[in-house]
């Protein structure tokens, strides 16, 4: 049994031979951006979702702190995607891990127009029929 989404994505990529390069430098570039999602995007965007949408009490400090960090992470993604189609070479599990969080940019009250490279990347991924079908599955 494999648990944790990042480990599951790595397992599936290894098993299928898809979406993870075999060349070491390219492989670790994908892993680096997968870990960026696991350690940064997921936790921070999740806190934005909680404090903006689910918390019974509005806590301005928490909302501001996580929203500010969320926008900073969008900036990191935007810089990374400048002149690149995907986060790490070809489309990879790093993109698949980050996409669901960006898909909920409306929950974060983030306008993708503020991050044109992220917006382009998002549109490119959402043009893939398999990803669109996956994002249509209720969580």
Give a label for each model feature:
Residues 1-71, 78, 83, 87:
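GST-like domain detector, emphasizing the conserved glutathione-binding G-site
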Residues 8, 77, 95, 125-128:
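Residue-level signal for nonpolar/aromatic packing positions in well-ordered secondary structure
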Residues 13, 101-102, 135:
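Active-site-flanking alpha-helical
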Residues 28-31, 97, 119, 132:
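Generic structural signal for individual residues within well-ordered alpha-helical segments
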Residues 40, 45-49, 86-113, 119, ...:
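GST superfamily/GST-like fold recognition
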Residues 118-139:
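Long hydrophobic alpha-helical segments typical of transmembrane helices together
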